[in-house]
Amino acid sequence: MNEELAEVAASTRLAELGITLPAVPAPVAAYLPAVVSAGQVFTAGQLPFVDGHLLETGKVGAGVSPERAAELARVAALNAVAAAASVVGGVDGIRRVVKLVVFVASDPAFTGQPQVANGASELLLSVFGERGRHARSAVGVAVLPLDSPVEVELVVEASAASF
């Protein structure tokens, strides 16, 4: 394999970025944070929790700025990566990111959901490089659990060695 095309391990990228993979946030209801099926990992919706605390509440476009919401989407995406990593033996057990879904609690007039979702997408590209390129949906919704401004779901492919 061409050395220029060789991928850097996700754990190495996290260290280079100064990012520590957080503990998986505890579920707030009767579900699992992530499950593996047919070589893919599906995460539950992840909120922007840090150390057990939701960083912000409210709607984007009415109290929460789009820029702040993009930061929150990044935090929620990191929590989703942690959830996926927890069922495949660590972050290096993730072969590639397949799909990202970002739900944005939006004021009715707000239409910038894709820009909010970029916070999550950019984190995934930073951590996984080309393996972080993904399909994506950015969905505006009326309200999210706990009045969170954003919620993130991931589908990733697990590496064969993680089974």
Ranges and model annotations:
Residues 2-163:
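Short, polar/acidic, helix-capping and beta-turn segments at strand->helix junctions
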